[in-house]
Amino acid sequence: TAGGDLYGIAGNASYQYAYTIYVLPYSIIAVSITTAVFPRMSRAISEHRIGDARADLSSSLRSTGLAMFFFTAVMIAMPVPLVKALIPSTNVHGAILISGPLIGLLVGLVPTSAFLLVQRAFYAYEDGRSPFLFAAADNAVQLLLLLTSLRFAPPKYWTLMVALSLSLSYIITFPWVFWLLRRRFGGRIDGKRIIIMHVKALIAGAAACACGLFLNPLVTRLVGAKVSSVNGHMSWWQSIVICAILTIVVTAVYAGLLWLMRVEEFSSLIVTMKARLLRRTSTATSVSTPAESETEEAQAQN
C-alpha cells in the first residue's frame, strides 16, 4: 500500500473495490444501450442512411447521459453507506478508504460512458484509427496528470489521484473525439440537443447530490450509525436503510428538476413508463375477467 501504512492509507485493494462499484452502472446501462444500438447504427451507415444513424447516436448519448448523471449523483451522495451495503465484510474505516477513489472515478462516469457509444460509432464506419488516437491522447493526459499530482500530493492521496486522473483525462480529451466524430457525420451530429440535455442533467444532478450530501450525516445519526476512521460503526442493515432514504431523496430532487427544466428525454421516459403500466394493468384485467365469469357461472349452476 502507498506510503507504507497498510491500514491507514488507501491502496490497490481499495482502488479495485472502488472500480468494481463504479463500473456497475456503466456495465448495466451504458453497455446495454450500446449493445442494442450498435447493430442498428451499423446497418444505417452501411445503407448510407446517415440521418438515421445520427438520430440513433444522439438519442443513445442523451439517454445514457441522463442515467449516468443520476447514478453519479446518488453514489457520490452516500459513498460510505453504499460501499458498506455492497461489501458487507468491510468495516467503516475500510469503506472510507474505498470511498475516496470511488468518488474520483465517479467524476468521469458520464464521459466514460459516452465514449463507449462514440467508439462504436467509429467502428460502425469501420474506423479503428480514431478511437486509437483518442485512447493514446487520453492515456498521455492521464499519465501527465497523475505524475504531476504524485509530485505534489502526499502519499495518502495517491490512490485518489489515480482515480481522478482517469476521470479528468476523459473530461479533457472527450471534446476532441466528439469533434472527430462530428466530421465523420458530415459536420452535423445533433450537438446542440446533446449539449443542452447534458447541461440540464448536470444542474439537476449537482443539486440532487448536494441535497443527498446534506442529509447523509443526519440520516446516518438517525439510524444510530457513525462514520469515522477511529470509532465508526455501521451495520449492513443500517447501510441499506441509509441508502434507501438518500436514494429516494436524490431521485425526487433529480426528477423534479428535470421536469421543471422540461428535459425531453425525461418526459419521454415518463410517457413510456405510463404506457407500460397501463398495458400491464389492462392485460391483468383481461386475464382476470374470464376467471371471474367462470366463477359466477359455477355459482349460478350450484
Features from the language model and the residues they span:
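Membrane-embedded alpha-helical bundles of multi-pass transporters/translocases
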Residues: 1-302
